[in-house]
Amino acid sequence: MAVDTMESVAVVAVPFPAQGHLNQLLHLSLLLASRGLSVHYAAPPPHVRQARARVHGWDPRALGSIRFHDLDVPPYDSPAPDLAAPSPFPNHLMPMFEAFAAAARAPLAALLQRLSTSYRRVAVVFDRLNPFAATEAARLANADAFGLQCVAISYNVGWLDPGHRLLSDYGLQFLPPDACMSREFVDLVFRMEEEEQGAPVAGLVMNTCRALEGEFLDVVAAQPPFQGQRFFAVGPLNPLLLDADAPTTPPGQARHECLEWLDRQPPESVLYVSFGTTSCLHADQVAELAAALKGSKQRFVWVLRDADRADIYAESGESRHAMFLSEFTRETEGTGLVITGWAPQLEILAHGATAAFMSHCGWNSTIESLSHGKPVLAWPMHSDQPWDSELLCKYFKAGLLVRPWEKHAEIVPAQAIQKVIEEAMLSDSGMAVRQRAKELGEAVRASVADGGNSRKDLDDFIGYITR
């Protein structure tokens, strides 16, 4: 493709301001920039900083290929997560979500207007939770809007037709949004969708691949809301790392201590435990999980941290688990490692010593784990995570259920957790699940290689926006 054709097109990425959304669009932005496109990434200032600081799997110098823009929004409260809240949904983020929904449109419109005068074409790739971006793109004669699907495409099948044959054939249960999200968040999403209804969208970009969700892709493409749209299944967006036994950190940067620790462990001997950036465990549950890890006698890396605040740079103070950790780390020295800060998840999952992943089942974590051939011990917390847990355990057959969603308000006892850990790490049935995850990982890797379906869809997307 001619260089002048690429340079005459601007891509504007507009993420929703939460970690699991920020990083997907930044991964896509880096992919597109690596192909020679001019890419602009627009978010509130703390979230631009957050996305840049937390991206991993790329050479840090790659960030220089992206132009970052601040979408200024009014001040908002950034409280700590409410550990006493009746719902596990991170409702403490709602002040920020509301401020963003109300105020991000104007600075985005100004940015798009400015870019539209400098480029032949502007392609706006927006998180589907930001439908106002499509409306603003439609005001410009030389702009197209493309929604980014940040959750599994199969989630749309459950949303549109919970009784669909694919769900019943595999025994998949779809929970309505208000069962696993707060009423305030559901109301915000529906309100934004209603306000922007009718905004033209040229297509849908998806962080998935046919190797994982091919059947569901075909079903969704035939549904009335999506008929006539172009579908680009370009996932996984996360980089696919090689076995990280050898250091991959660029010269001059320190390698995370957990990777050095993993280097000293036998192959496929370590359980990685992390529940993402929007979930907290109650102190009683932390104690039960700790007892299970200790009792299983399995090696582990455990990321023990609370959910992000709206502004992660407003966080301060030591971990609330500090007293517990001083004793637990002493008791498990040599067997496990606890991380209370940010962890390099992709590198951990790619490491040859890592055997499995105990996870909240966010779509990022799900696809990152499968793309590196690692099974998931499923512990869904909120939002689309119960659905991802269903997919992992029943459809992909690459997961083991730790806690069913209907028991999300209960403390899971150590004995039950330990049983699943031992099944995953020691049993024949666990070995079968691990083998299935490896097979899926190989299929996912093939999809992004030359000639793979995801590579073709990425090429088609670039070809369309630079036409």
From Swiss-Prot:
Optimum pH is 7.5. CDD domains: GT1_Gtf-like. Highly expressed in root. Expressed at lower level in kernel and cob. Weakly expressed in leaves. Weakly or not expressed in stems. The keyword Transferase applies. Its EC number is 2.4.1.215. GO terms for biological process: cytokinin metabolic process; protein glycosylation; regulation of cytokinin-activated signaling pathway; regulation of hormone levels. It catalyses: cis-zeatin + UDP-alpha-D-glucose = O-beta-D-glucosyl-cis-zeatin + UDP + H(+). SUPFAM superfamilies: UDP-Glycosyltransferase/glycogen phosphorylase. Keywords: Glycosyltransferase, Transferase. The active site is at residues 21, 127. One of its GO terms (molecular function) is cis-zeatin O-beta-D-glucosyltransferase activity. It is an enzyme of class 2 (transferase). An anthocyanidin binds at residues 21, 91. UDP-alpha-D-glucose binds at residues 343, 345, 360, 363-365, 368, 384-385. InterPro entries: UDP_glucos_trans (IPR002213), UDP_glycos_trans_CS (IPR035595). PANTHER family: CIS-ZEATIN O-GLUCOSYLTRANSFERASE 1, GLYCOSYLTRANSFERASE. Utilizes UDP-glucose as the sugar donor and catalyzes the formation of O-beta-D-glucosyl-cis-zeatin from cis-zeatin. May regulate active versus storage forms of cytokinins and could have an impact on seed growth. Belongs to the UDP-glycosyltransferase family. This is Cis-zeatin O-glucosyltransferase 1. It comes from Zea mays. The gene is CISZOG1.
